[in-house]
Amino acid sequence: LIRLKAGQTHLLDDIDHLKNRRVRLSGELIQTQFRIGVNRLERVVKTRLNDPTVAASFFPDPTEQALLARQAKKRRAMKQTKTGSQLTRKLHATGRTGHSKEKLRQKSNDIAVNSRHARWTSFVRTSVISSTMREFFGSSQLSQFMDQTNPLAEVTHKRRLSSLGPGGLHRDRAGLIVRGIHPSYYGRVCPIETPEGKNAGLVGSLASFAQINADGFVMAPYYKMQKEQIRPNTQGFFLLTACYEDQAVLASGDVNLAKPRVSTRLRRAFTEHAPKKIDYLGLCPIQFMSIATALIPFLEHDDANRALMGSNMQRQAVSLLRSERAFVGTGLEGRITRDSGSLLVAKQTGYVTYADAQRIEYVTPKDDPTGTQFKLIAHSVELESYHRSNQDSCLHHRPLVEANTWVQKGDCLADNTATFGGELALGRNIFVGYMPWEGYNFEDAVLVSERLVFDDLFTSIHIERYDVETARLQDGQEYFT
């Protein structure tokens, strides 16, 4: 309280600070839902146990149970005496008395176990847990179909952060403060990429190098600075949480350390310090933005609103019939396609033995510690051929390797519909003229060449599924015409 009286307001708790927020991953959400299902099952079991008719079948009266046991024992003894003599004569004739007795005893034990299992399965209904999990995956606000429009949309959807859902905020009651950009977002949450409309500021995306620790806090990587020199560790960098950042002086990865004073951040404030006062240095300039925003060339010259629109519109680009690599890129096109999982790469260096539109086969040498044997391991990679995605677009692989050729570890084996040579290819490179043309492009109108249509430059394939039902009527079976 004395420090607050002195004006040290940085000691106040900030609800929007990332040190006071944690990320609940999908595994934790599923675990919580499974716990709800187990609790429901417990209540169902307790309810059925309280039912006298149900409980009597599992916990009968001891006196009655003893009487029933004696009667059952007498019946078994009489039955064994009656059938034992006949069975013994047959077994002695064949010479397999001991083996058949053991088999008969095992069969009776199995029948007893199955009867007890049948009683408990009719008593404990696992459908309660199944319906709870189905409810989460089918109707939860945080359960969505993966966006498969292009590889960038897949990666962005997997790295999305949402403040909505159970235990979160409501879009109609969230104000401007909670939607705003907090200084602790630097290097953790992208300040640019967010939806337009009611979800603005409530749904975001992880920064390019951000990671989430076991406690659910978002961490950002930094280089440790000591005497104006980078002090590496085993990883080469340090991962800092937002709570630890408040105690250090941080600088961006593109500052000029030769200047007497550089721009820094300290306790959520942007200030200036001498280079020797810097505690941590950022990795690179794109550290604070998401991967979709990092794909925009010359982002520093863009307006903030246009950068936001460009980040969202890239995810809406439909895969074309003929893809083409962009002339101007940022260097992340190849890494995004590999991280999305839609690109097929060689796991080891090997020799391609067979390649067609359906599969690619290659062999790799097996490591032998003794060095006396040479063995080959065969690998087969299945290719997708005109599969329908969640957005009714086309998922197709084109092989890039031929038979009787060598491939290195990490080489691209096949392209998909949104890649070219292993790099992301969203759209085509076209020549654009910014000029009037006899009034045809008045205001926001666009005049295009007929080559865009006849040469299929922007032609895409869509696969849709339609279900038609037939019924069996009194007059006969319906059929398609």
Located regions from the model:
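Long, charge-dense accessory insertions within large macromolecular proteins
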Residues: 19-76, 81-84, 90-95, 100-193, ...
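Active-site diphosphate/adenylate-binding microenvironment
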Residues: 6-7
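Short active-site loop/helix that positions an aromatic residue
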Residues: 210-214
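Short, charged/polar, low-complexity loop and linker segments
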Residues: 10-12
